[in-house]
């Protein structure tokens, strides 16, 4: 075991950090490279268009990547401490499906994506609270 990864919650934290790092890179490419190309092709003001792209992605893509990283890290953390390969599979499959759902809906249905992301965040938060309570009870039993 490592001090840096000594409970399932650590997987969630690391997953979110990595996913938001990736989201930063991806947003850079969308805001500066993709928006620049589209602005030139459509004869739009680059700064105005790139601002709109950045603003839109800040409410959709960034939370989506953060949630996917949390889901991936949560299930990977469970796998790391249980050895159950079902959790390893879920750590890969669920973010893949959520991202595919996000891409499928796209901008016209973005409110649906936001509602789904919020719902999944609440479910994940509830599961984490249960895990933390379980760990706290285990630690109290060890003290006795």
PLM feature segments, named:
Residues 1-144:
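Hydrophobic alpha-helical segments at protein termini of multi-pass membrane proteins
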């Amino acid at each position: 075991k490592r001090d840096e990864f000594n409970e399932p919650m650590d997987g969630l934290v690391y997953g979110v950090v990595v996913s938001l790092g990736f989201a930063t890179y991806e947003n850079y490419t969308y805001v500066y490279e993709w928006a620049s190309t589209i602005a030139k092709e459509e004869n739009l003001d680059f700064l105005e268009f790139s601002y709109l792209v950045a603003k839109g992605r800040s409410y959709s893509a960034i939370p989506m990547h953060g949630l996917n990283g949390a889901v991936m890290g949560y299930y990977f953390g469970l796998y790391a401490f249980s050895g159950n390969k079902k959790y390893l599979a879920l750590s890969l499959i669920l973010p893949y499906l959520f991202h595919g759902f996000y891409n499928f809906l796209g901008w016209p249905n973005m409110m649906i994506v936001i509602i789904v992301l919020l719902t999944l965040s609440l479910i994940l938060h509830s599961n984490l609270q249960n895990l933390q309570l379980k760990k706290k009870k285990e630690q109290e039993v060890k003290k006795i």
